């Protein structure tokens, strides 16, 4: 009687490489679906120090006649744009690389600051500013606050609307305005106590602190 040959059993091997590859693929796919964006941060460098804001405060107080807030705004806007191009944007890192300056986006940011000044006017009035009597001065103050935040506004638009990092700059401008309010009701009868002169100066000082030290906060 012939002996039947046994067929050798095949040993099953378990490999996790396919599972790992599939898991990595699914994780990468979920990142795309969730719209995960690269990190953004500001380099700790002297480039972010806005020395021009201190110079503008000095000119506003010592050079301009009667604290001309409109002339100060005319000086602020171009200097803020230049500061963003040559200083702040060079210190902004998005996704481990420095972004090139987008000039069309810079123009859009100017319009965004003008539009932003409208809700800022409303907020200032809600905090006690004259409603109609000094509306022009209040709007000038709102424009100053908006354009002081111009580098942050541009960066929000340029970094896919990641606003978390940039909130500190807006907050410090507001804090500067709030602290400077204390001198208005004091009975000193000084010209610089008139609305909105001390608030403008406080906004500039708050912006200076924000942009100079924002990377360290």
From Swiss-Prot:
Q: Name one GO biological process term.
A: GPI anchor biosynthetic process
Q: Which InterPro entries has this protein been placed in? A: GPI_biosynthesis_protein_Pig-F
> What glycosylation sites does the entry record?
102
GO molecular function annotations of the record: mannose-ethanolamine phosphotransferase activity
Q: Which residues cross the membrane?
A: 45-65, 68-88, 107-127, 134-154, 169-189, 197-217
GO CC annotations, alphabetized: endoplasmic reticulum membrane
Keyword Glycoprotein set for record: yes
Q: Which keywords annotate this record?
A: Endoplasmic reticulum, Glycoprotein, GPI-anchor biosynthesis, Membrane, Transmembrane, Transmembrane helix
Compartments, record wording: Endoplasmic reticulum membrane
Give each disulfide bond as a residue pair: none
Q: In what pathway does it function?
A: Glycolipid biosynthesis; glycosylphosphatidylinositol-anchor biosynthesis
Q: How does the protein's chain sit in the membrane according to the entry?
A: Multi-pass membrane protein
The protein's matches in Pfam families, at most eight in alphabetical order, are given as: PIG-F
Please describe what this protein does: Acts in the GPI biosynthetic pathway between GlcNAc-PI synthesis and GPI transfer to protein.
Q: Which family does it belong to?
A: Belongs to the PIGF family.
Q: What is this protein called?
A: Glycosylphosphatidylinositol anchor biosynthesis protein 11
What species was this sequence derived from? Candida glabrata (strain ATCC 2001 / BCRC 20586 / JCM 3761 / NBRC 0622 / NRRL Y-65 / CBS 138)
């Amino acid at each position: 009687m012939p002996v039947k040959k046994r067929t050798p059993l095949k040993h099953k091997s378990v490999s996790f490489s396919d599972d790992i590859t599939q898991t990595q693929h699914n994780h990468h796919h979920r990142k795309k679906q969730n719209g995960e964006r690269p990190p953004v941060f500001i380099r700790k460098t002297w480039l972010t120090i806005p020395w021009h804001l201190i110079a503008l405060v000095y000119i506003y107080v010592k050079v301009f006649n009667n604290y001309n807030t409109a002339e100060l705004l005319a000086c602020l806007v171009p200097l803020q744009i230049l500061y963003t191009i040559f200083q702040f944007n060079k210190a902004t890192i998005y996704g481990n690389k420095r972004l090139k300056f987008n000039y069309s986006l810079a123009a859009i940011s100017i319009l965004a600051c003008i539009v932003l000044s409208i809700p800022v006017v409303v907020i200032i009035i809600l905090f006690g500013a004259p409603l109609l009597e000094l509306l022009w001065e209040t709007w000038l103050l709102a424009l100053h606050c908006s354009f002081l935040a111009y580098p942050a506004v541009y960066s929000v638009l340029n970094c896919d609307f990641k606003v978390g990092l940039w909130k500190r700059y807006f907050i410090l401008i507001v804090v500067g305005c709030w602290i400077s309010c204390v001198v208005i009701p004091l009975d000193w009868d000084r010209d610089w106590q008139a609305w909105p002169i001390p608030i403008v100066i406080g906004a500039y000082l708050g912006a200076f602190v924000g942009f100079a030290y924002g990377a360290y906060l």
